[in-house]
């Protein structure tokens, strides 16, 4: 919150008491974990109105669509004179979403005060820079990623609907570079060992350690928020909410 004191504004982070924001859980042993109903009021962070807002404003967010094979679609982009990067066509984005394709919104970490405050709690607890990534589908029978790994540790927050997950014992070594064509166990008939088999429901939170293989099995209309925690902390992100006097 903001407190007016003379000519200055003193800022105090809204400290969240959440079971997964506990360094003691991670200091000796790094394994996938789940906390049931651990995130109160999850739709304060993202809901279908905010999803529509982001896809109506692709100039300000990284918006993507997954194809039926679980790979990111390379949609045509246009370069407008006032913007420094290519922007996908909104009509194509909404057509894909309304057909039931899985969508992704990245660079969502400053969307609103609730998101900023949640990520500030992460960054004040752990040695990391965070973003928020939104995943979802508006129709049943959508597809998502196959078995894959990510560089940073990740917290998956189920916002709406349900998602079944497998998290595996296998990890990719830090010796291996992340590329646009990573090793895909599913395509190589590589059977992985399940460490965690779980279905997340609204308010549930799951932790996936760095470089650990994992795979979602989505069903039904759903929304989730991923919080990747890139370590170590590099440049602090200003998550304060300022006012104009």
Which sequence ranges carry the predicted segments?
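Active-site region of the double-stranded beta-helix
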Residues: 5-18, 23-26, 41-45, 52-53, ...
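Residue-level recognition of conserved beta-strand edge/terminus positions
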Residues: 207-209
């Amino acid at each position: 919150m903001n407190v007016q004191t003379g000519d200055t504004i003193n800022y105090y982070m809204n400290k969240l008491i959440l079971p997964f924001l506990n360094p003691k859980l991670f200091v000796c042993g790094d394994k996938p974990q789940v906390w049931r109903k651990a995130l109160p009021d999850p739709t304060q962070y993202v809901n279908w109105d905010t999803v529509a807002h982001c896809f109506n404003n692709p100039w300000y967010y990284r918006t993507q669509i997954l194809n039926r094979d679980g790979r990111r679609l390379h949609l045509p982009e246009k370069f407008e004179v006032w913007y420094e990067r290519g922007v996908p066509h909104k009509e194509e984005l909404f057509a894909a979403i309304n057909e039931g394709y899985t969508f992704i919104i990245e660079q969502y970490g400053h969307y609103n005060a609730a998101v900023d405050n949640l990520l500030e709690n992460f960054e004040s607890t752990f040695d990391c820079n965070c973003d928020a990534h939104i995943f979802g589908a508006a129709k049943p029978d959508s597809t998502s990623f196959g078995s894959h790994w990510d560089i940073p540790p990740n917290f998956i927050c189920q916002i709406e609907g349900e998602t079944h997950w497998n998290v595996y014992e296998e990890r990719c070594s830090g010796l291996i570079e992340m590329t646009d064509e990573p090793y895909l166990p599913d395509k190589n008939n590589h059977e992985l060992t399940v460490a965690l088999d779980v279905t997340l429901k609204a308010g549930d939170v799951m932790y996936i350690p760095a470089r650990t293989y994992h795979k979602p099995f989505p069903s039904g209309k759903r929304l989730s928020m991923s919080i990747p925690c890139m370590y170590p902390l590099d440049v602090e992100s200003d998550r304060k909410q300022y006012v104009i006097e």
